[in-house]
């Protein structure tokens, strides 16, 4: 496979700008429907959870390549350059959740943010996490992301509150296991 594409221009391009009232964005993508079957290198100002719904893809972050299969996922910290592409002849559908940091706490001067979240997100080695079902705490996080997906597929009034709940729960597990 030719990886020259990963050395091409790296840009910031949000999927959609988040509004001042939106705390998250969900986007379901099919790698085969993307230009050149590639999610070009980029970064986002929000946290991202990526969950593979079906198939397999190659995911790159911090000069590392990962094969990600159905039922697996990633967490990306803000500002992490990442990309994805098809792997061999596999199809791949995946969901991306872009999460505003304000989902966790409205302001960065919040004592809980300062105590639990800031040390994680500001740590230079905390750029990303992989989630695989073989690891119990990661399996639990993957289940929460699946629940978020189910809720977004059939939203009812207040569904955003459930999403916020799951995001806080995910960060609780990340904090205790990283």
List each model region and its residues.
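A conserved hydrophobic position in a structured secondary element of the catalytic/binding core
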Residues: 76-77, 99
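Short histidine-centered beta-strand/loop micro-motifs
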Residues: 37-44, 85-87, 107-109, 159
């Amino acid at each position: 496979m030719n990886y020259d594409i990963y050395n091409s221009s790296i840009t910031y391009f949000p999927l959609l700008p988040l509004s001042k009232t939106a705390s998250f964005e969900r986007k379901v993508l099919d790698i085969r429907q993307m230009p050149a079957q590639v999610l070009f290198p980029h970064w986002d100002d929000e946290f991202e959870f990526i969950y593979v719904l079906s198939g397999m893809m190659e995911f790159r972050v911090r000069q590392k390549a990962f094969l990600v299969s159905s039922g697996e996922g990633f967490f990306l910290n803000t500002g992490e350059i990442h990309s994805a592409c098809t792997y061999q002849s596999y199809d791949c559908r995946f969901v991306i959740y872009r999460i505003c940091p304000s989902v966790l706490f409205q302001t960065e001067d919040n004592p809980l943010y300062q105590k639990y979240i800031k040390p994680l997100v500001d740590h230079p080695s905390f750029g990303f996490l992989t989630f695989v079902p073989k690891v119990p705490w990661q399996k639990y996080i993957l289940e929460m992301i699946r629940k978020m997906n189910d809720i977004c597929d059939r939203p009812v009034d207040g569904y955003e509150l459930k999403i916020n709940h799951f995001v806080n729960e995910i960060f609780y597990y990340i904090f205790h296991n990283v």
